[in-house]
Amino acid sequence: MLAVTLLSLALLGSTCACSTSTSYEAGIVCRITKAALLVLNQETAKVIQTAFQRASYPDIKGERSMMLLGRVTYGLHNIQISHLSIASSQVELVEAKSVDVSIQNASVIFKGTLNYGYKGAWGLNIEQSVDFEIESAIDLQINTKLTCDSGHVRTDAPDCSISFHKLLLHLQGEREPGWTKQLFTNIISFTLKMVLKGQVCKEINVISNIMADFVQTRAANIISDRDIEVDISLTRSPIITATYLESHHKGHFIYKNISEVLPLPAFSPTLLGDTRMLYFWFSEQVLDSLAKAAFQDGRLQLNLAETELKVVLETWHFNPNQEIIPEVITGFPSPGQVTVHCPRRPTISCQNKGVVVSSPVVMEFLFPHKDGQDSVTHTFEEDIVATIQASYSKKKLFLSLVDFQIKPKTTSNMAESSESIQNFLQLMITTVGIPEIMSRLEVALTTLMNSKGLDLFDIINPEIITRDGFLLLQMDFGFPEHLLVDFLQSLN
């Protein structure tokens, strides 16, 4: 159950404002469907086993008057789990209510020490201490609600029940029934059932909230990088339907702890389906804010030394007219470097044909001066509008250029400028600059995503789709074993 609900939260995870609004306003929306829950349910046994093992089982003590034996006292001590196996489990989504998980035919073996004694009618005092095993077969029903507490997502399982089909007491490893075994089985069975139910259900709630914090921290880390963070607070409580779980997030970017709060766009549930396991909806406002944060952080700049520039030109098979290049660098013995940067922040919008990036671009040719300082010999600025489509395959991000427009704006050192130089620079940006920037972005973004552990997920047939005003990710996935392993290790 925890593997279902809480690993779902690893995908949905966030802090929340606990709003009771019925509106659908968000910058980011996440939908995880019933098919995904069935995959996550595969490893329910490991988390349930952890709950049983972590539960603290109190000593069970009591006494009872028995015919012939007199007053019998008993105590079960050091109760622990020695084995647990689950035959099957099912998960259901109850609309507007809960995530329900049924576990059938779980085999659980408890072990510990039994102390007992009695004073018989003939003055006999008998005290014994023996090791025991309790062999049980149970069904477990857990109905989990997603709630908010102190600004965080919390899970609550008020409906947690355990049904015992078998409860056998074995003393010192013996399997043949005896009067002692029969006596204490009858005495302690009811008490033991109540204690186990209370402790196991309590531990399930404890672990669920530990895991909620774990996955929310992990989710926040995945979408943060240095001074750039994303506010993924919920704009309303999570939605549960018969076919999916859905959460709605602000998606405001935070740069150096300063957040720009913008009006949230409207989201329509009909924009997402339920045939894939996982959906993410991003408004173009989120992508535009990302471009702004990257610009503020100085990430939109490229510096190439002379040797690097030559390698880049060769990579893209650029063979410019040899008479033009000397004209650009007239008066300087050897070029220092070329710098490409955005003087103002880019803007991003989403259209059916792709993500549209509009940005002013400045190219500066820098050459060493006689006094050892760099000197700008030529500056070329233009406005570029590029339409890009993206795909993700074999754990790598790929960008493809669908369309572009270039509008020259200004050049410096006009005495050295000419129409041929402008044509050369425009040609170089078209055939080298844009492809090189996109290639470097592919590598940088893939490296960033993998540094956050994205490559550890088994992502199946992902699709990146753009529509007017938003970008949509939809995919299937295999069970995120690494998340479960990390979480279970964190409990130790």
Curated annotation (Swiss-Prot):
Protein name in UniProt: Cholesteryl ester transfer protein
Signal sequence, renumbered to the chain: 1-17
InterPro entries: Bactericidal_perm-incr_a/b_dom (IPR017943), Cholesteryl_ester_transfer (IPR017130), Lipid-bd_serum_glycop_C (IPR001124), Lipid-bd_serum_glycop_CS (IPR017954), Lipid-bd_serum_glycop_N (IPR017942)
Function recorded in the entry: Involved in the transfer of neutral lipids, including cholesteryl ester and triglyceride, among lipoprotein particles. Allows the net movement of cholesteryl ester from high density lipoproteins/HDL to triglyceride-rich very low density lipoproteins/VLDL, and the equimolar transport of triglyceride from VLDL to HDL. Regulates the reverse cholesterol transport, by which excess cholesterol is removed from peripheral tissues and returned to the liver for elimination.
Organism from which the protein derives: Cricetulus griseus
A single cellular component GO annotation: extracellular space
Record CDD domains: BPI1
Disulfide bonds: 160-201
One Gene Ontology MF term: triglyceride binding
Superkingdom of this protein's organism: Eukaryota
Glycosylation sites: 257
Protein family (similarity comment): Belongs to the BPI/LBP/Plunc superfamily. BPI/LBP family.
